[in-house]
């Protein structure tokens, strides 16, 4: 691993690292916030997944999460949103290719060689964080938009791995909305049954009651993508039918930007702390 930058922040350390990923077959960067040490107990981790066009730095520089994370004693880990590099398949659109990995394992050429973000987030990155930093094995996950989709599918596909999950303006039924249809048809092929494995609503309907974990979703009602791309009410109905402990908050006037995230990130960190710090 190579340390790219480091900054003292609220008596903790904000760092950016590069490492060679065997899962993605390319170098990857991630950002991490290490809160000031409190005692000899390793702190828990919150993984944050960002949205389309983003990298590991958007949340770090725009969300203002470090102050509360330092207070609570929670490590923040921000991976990139896709594999990167000249040898990595790409597309001219903002919603496919680099910066738009959708947190799945691609099965179709040319994407399958590198686009295995699900395996990277499930296995390689947590193992790296565990081995290189003083952290506990308790973790939660959160994200925004495409990253909210990622957080939800990571939690739904891995019962017992996370204490809680939250999301801001998540894509919840990618099989049925333009962003998801475009990405899934390219990454996964035309078999729509294969798409269901990466769709939060489908995964929610297939879930077992004993696997449910506390879930918080915030959605601005002035979000330009709300009607066509996000549709959180569809997931809320699935959660209702499955008696899944999910809170959906519609926030009046808020849009899809990081100003929205910055306004409510403290709520999300305190929500996760209830379960991470048990």
From Swiss-Prot:
Q: Which GO terms describe its cellular component?
A: cytosol
GO MF annotations, alphabetized: carboxylic ester hydrolase activity; S-formylglutathione hydrolase activity
According to UniProt, the reaction catalysed is:
S-formylglutathione + H2O = formate + glutathione + H(+)
- GO biological process: what's one of them? formaldehyde catabolic process
Alphabetic keyword roster? Hydrolase, Serine esterase
Catalytic center residues: 145 (charge relay system), 223 (charge relay system), 256 (charge relay system)
InterPro entries, alphabetically? Answer: AB_hydrolase_fold, Esterase-like, S-formylglutathione_hydrol
The EC number on file is: 3.1.2.12
The domain of life is: Bacteria
- What does this protein's UniProt record list under function? Serine hydrolase involved in the detoxification of formaldehyde. Hydrolyzes S-formylglutathione to glutathione and formate.
The UniProt family comment states: Belongs to the esterase D family.
Protein name per UniProt: S-formylglutathione hydrolase YeiG
Organism listed in the record = Escherichia coli (strain SMS-3-5 / SECEC)
Q: Output the lineage of the source organism.
A: Bacteria, Pseudomonadati, Pseudomonadota, Gammaproteobacteria, Enterobacterales
